[in-house]
Amino acid sequence: MSDREEKTGKNDNGKKNKGGKRNKIVAIEMIILVLLIMTAVAIFIQRDKSVKEAAKIHNQKAKKTEQTPQAAQKENEIEEETEGTEEETGDRDASVPDRSNFAVQPGVPVGTTEQSDEKIVYLTLDDGPSDNTQAVLDILDKYNAKATFFVTGEMPEYKDMIKAAYDKGHTIGMHTYSHDYAKVYASVDAYFQDLDQIGQMVQEEIGYVPCFIRFPGGSSNTVSKKYTAGIMSTLVQEVQNRGYQYYDWNGSSGDGSVRTTEELVAQATSFDSNNIILLCHDSHGKQTTVEALPQIIEHYQSLGYTFKALDRDSFVAHHGVNN
């Protein structure tokens, strides 16, 4: 082989070696590129998963946050349904009585016939609710005064006022459903049937049957003799045996009869006991009572009296039974 041919062969071999090296480099570069692409894809997939997971967690938190008010609302609804069992704790308005034990409980005594040293007017309003009840509530709000409503079913279209009064912190008592002397005093059973009827209506409004009652005409009424001799002597004992307490009064506005506003004020402000259970009416037609209330309240408040609603520990006025 000539020197030229040998040199040419060497050159060809060199070119082949260089070409092989170049191919290897390209192959390595391709492998690296593929690895980089795979790594990028893996990072993208992982990032996408992380984003989705974060979004999922965020949505769960948002959903939980949205549900919290609903849960609170549900809890409030449950509390309202059991209002007669437990309510008004902690920062409860001191002028509103603790009503957790106001439901009738046979065998549990209610009230005391001993007056407290505190100067208190227990304003009581009979024979409502009616078209006058809202005006009475507005006046009580204005003077931050609490009262007790001995309600009947004579005007059932106003029964929502029972809950309205209760929600404002006033006490609800029962005065029989019909307030019909001939009906309620026909017999002991007749009285309790009528009382149960008003109890059912009150329970529908405030969630329980209260232990506070007032007899039509008071326990000392004599009209009951016309229907059943001796019935009041039986009833005053039987209502207490069944867990109720009956409330008469030791002060009256005299609005059971037709009186002017001035006459009502003069009569209602003539009492000076430490504890005054004051009889008034919020029934239909008692507009003069509504007009007299501001002056009555102002009079007693100026003398240091507080207007409170009856509760289980309040003073109880009992008249002498005449039948």
Model-derived features: positions:
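Gram-positive cell-envelope targeting signals
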Residues: 1-70, 300
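Catalytic domains of cell-wall/extracellular-matrix polysaccharide-remodeling enzymes
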Residues: 181-279, 283-299, 305, 319-323
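Active-site beta->alpha N-cap acidic-glycine motif
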Residues: 93-191, 196-209, 299, 315
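Residue-level detector of transmembrane insertion/anchoring sites
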Residues: 37-38, 116, 165, 271
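Hydrophobic alpha-helical membrane context
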Residues: 35-36, 138, 187, 293
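A short glycine-rich beta-strand->turn/loop micro-motif centered on a GG-aromatic cluster
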Residues: 150-153, 304-318
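A cross-domain feature marking catalytic cores of carbohydrate-active enzymes
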Residues: 125-127, 151-154, 174-176, 214-217, ...
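N-terminal, intrinsically disordered, polar/charged segments of Gram-positive cell-envelope systems
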Residues: 44-118
